């Protein structure tokens, strides 16, 4: 199981993980409303363990995404919920949650205390942590945490903000060299940077690097593609794949989302993705 400590926006990622017939545990909060109940019901239907999801007033915040006529994200605003109930869950039940997990998926722009507690537990039980970001203005303040993530996934613009450089207009080849140099000098374990239709570049602190092209598919709706990509990378690395192979899994899951109007990936068996994992009933 992968354990995800995150706000409601990461519900899609936990569903993507569950749709590869894995059994993730979701550590989060939801509203005390009918909408909150519906979220939990849907996650349970996907065979997600929701034992550590707390219902609190205003627990899901408000999220608005604006898309242009090509279906690409043009802007977004958000009102974040109070996430401290997640910290209380980790303080009370963190040992049992993390000790049973195969790895941890963590939102980087979550409260610092939650990040610190998660890393503390991950270190205690020798678990890998994979990071992703939604609110860049908050995440950039947490830049010093990058070296604690076994792998971090972001897009081209976010990577530019992290490294205080402008990557607009860079080719995949150019960006790959730049990211590799930055990752090696900053001693960040590994990073994957998505480039939309141009695919993704990846690099680790040992100097391994590469480019993985996007799959040529008919684009119906890009909503959720980044979440599926990240879920695929985290799944691959959790179960022993090299960075390139993990990016390949992420690319496949992202393509499966883009070609439909659904914002989560369809069901896959682990063996279809080259994963030698027994599926739990």
PLM segments and residue spans:
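Single conserved hydrophobic/aromatic residue that forms the stacking wall/gate
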Residues: 1-6, 10-13
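Alpha-helix C-terminal capping segments
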Residues: 12-23, 236-240
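Surface-exposed amphipathic alpha-helices with a cationic face
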Residues: 18, 116-126
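Conserved N-terminal subdomain of the carbohydrate kinase-like
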Residues: 19-102, 271-281
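Short beta->alpha connector loops
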Residues: 32-33, 109-113, 134-138
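Conserved phosphate/ATP/ADP-binding segment of small-molecule kinases
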Residues: 123-128, 133-209
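Conserved phosphate-binding/catalytic region of the ribokinase-like
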Residues: 169-281
